[in-house]
């Protein structure tokens, strides 16, 4: 159905939407575990991270080198891969850990070992063990083995849920918030079959995830205004040199022409739906591309006030 939708998208938008709906419905209902995954990321994790976090054994480890990660926070199809590629294409080689899920996986592991305890209102974490575990797991990644620097990139999509823990462990964290018109983002996500993201197969679930993301970004901007930079996809594609200079300056990295010539690199690796786009030069953002979809999503726009989030 997704192939059929792609085939008719230029001539018959109505039929494209019908194919997309059938494709998403069929895929989502093909595995009962997808419902559990949706509940995890739309309800359980957000509710857990709203609780007050307390730390025991709150001393820092004695590692000589303090990592200064650059976390890229963004929804699918919001330019995260483009920003990641720009940063890693500069003169100074910044290791790229992709979507390694170190934070989330470490938290699961420590929860299973009873090093993280949770009740109705609070979370109790053994900070010393958490800190050592997360640092160790990062250094075990191939990209950071034998690395002598302090900066690296992590683009794991769900990291935004854990921003409090991230700042506790890495106080010098830099966050690049990739922003896109939320309606455009909704349509762009729905037009894809993102197999590893079960919440993307329902318009209502996509909107719920967008709201969770938006609320969290607002909190980070309030609590850590100097540690977060918002990069709008439209601005990045319309003024790539100006915006890429802002990105590199925020990351304390030197800008060069190489930053915008990433598509010529032979060692460019990407495992996301943006694989094809980043192998081409940056094209200007097309505002009119999604206008024809408004009538099909109008009830969701009105219900959730999506255009004003």
Model-predicted segments: where are they?
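Short beta-strand segments
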Residues: 72-74, 152-156, 176-179, 230-235, ...
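Conserved nucleotide-binding/hydrolysis micro-motifs of P-loop NTPases
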Residues: 101-102, 180-185, 236-237
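PAPS-dependent sulfotransferases, especially Golgi type II membrane carbohydrate sulfotransferases
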Residues: 1-69, 123-125, 143-147, 186-230, ...
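Phosphate-binding active sites in nucleotide-utilizing proteins
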Residues: 60-170, 178-179
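Short gly/Ser/Thr-rich phosphate-binding loop of adenylate-forming enzymes
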Residues: 21, 163-166, 235
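Aromatic-acidic/polar surface patches that form glycan- and anion
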Residues: 76, 152-159, 206, 236, ...
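Conserved phosphate-donor/acceptor-positioning beta-strand/loop module used by diverse small-molecule
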Residues: 165-191, 247
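Short, conserved active-site loop motifs that form the nucleotide-linked donor/cofactor pocket
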Residues: 92, 173, 228
């Amino acid at each position: 159905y997704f192939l059929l939708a792609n085939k008719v998208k230029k001539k018959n938008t109505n039929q494209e939407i019908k194919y997309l709906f059938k494709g998403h419905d069929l895929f989502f209902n093909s595995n009962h575990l997808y419902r559990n995954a949706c509940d995890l990321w739309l309800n359980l994790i957000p509710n857990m991270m709203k609780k007050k976090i307390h730390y025991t054994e709150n001393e820092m480890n004695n590692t000589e080198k303090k990592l200064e990660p650059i976390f890229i926070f963004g929804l699918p199809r919001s330019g995260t891969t483009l920003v990641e590629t720009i940063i890693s294409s500069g003169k100074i080689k910044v290791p790229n850990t992709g979507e390694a899920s170190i934070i989330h996986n470490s938290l699961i592991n420590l929860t299973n070992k009873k090093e993280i305890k949770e009740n109705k209102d609070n979370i109790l974490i053994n900070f010393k063990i958490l800190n050592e575990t997360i640092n160790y797991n990062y250094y075990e990644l191939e990209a950071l083995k034998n690395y002598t620097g302090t900066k690296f990139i992590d683009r794991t999509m769900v990291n935004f849920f854990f921003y409090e823990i991230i700042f506790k462990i890495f106080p010098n964290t830099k966050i690049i918030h990739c922003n896109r018109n939320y309606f455009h983002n909704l349509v762009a996500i729905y037009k894809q079959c993102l197999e590893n993201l079960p919440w993307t197969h329902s318009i209502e679930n996509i909107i719920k995830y967008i709201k969770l993301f938006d609320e969290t970004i607002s909190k980070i901007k309030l609590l850590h205004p100097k540690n977060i930079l918002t990069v709008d996809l439209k601005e990045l594609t319309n003024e790539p040199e100006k915006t890429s200079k802002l990105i590199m300056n925020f990351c304390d990295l030197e800008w060069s022409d190489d930053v915008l010539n990433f598509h010529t690199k032979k060692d460019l690796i990407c495992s996301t739906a943006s694989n094809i786009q980043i192998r081409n030069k940056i094209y200007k953002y097309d505002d009119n591309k999604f206008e024809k979809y408004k009538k099909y999503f109008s009830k969701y726009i009105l219900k959730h006030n999506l255009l004003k989030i």
